Amino acid sequence: SLAEHGSLNDIDLHIRDITPHPLPGLPLDVTASIFGKADANAKVEDIALGIVHMVLQTIGQGAVFASLNGDIKNIVLIGNLTRLPQCPDIFPRLEDMCDVHFKIPEYAEYRTAIGAALCYIRNREYKDIFCGKC
């Protein structure tokens, strides 16, 4: 894919672009602004990687934010996006910074469909028990 041949160095603004010194909890290579350095001359491969990075960062940060009000430290990622080759680079960084653990189970790309099927079966069983004719 295009994204596999891209670089974020000319797309995302990193902490190192703002200061030469690491900030507490923010290493120099962490993204400060997604697409913060992109311009009209950016390579298509870099833009593709920037989009993939943005999507995965948003998913990861959304999951982290959703876990903040509870004791959730383990986050399971499922669906086709888990097959993107950029996942092993992005989620471990979030784990280090946010004190959570992301788990991508085997066959993660099928887990959404399996969950929908189980929900359908369980709901149907529930209706059969409590509604009689449903």
Can you say where each PLM-predicted feature lies in the sequence?
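Acidic-glycine-rich active-site phosphate/pyrophosphate-binding loop
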Residues: 29-39, 85-98
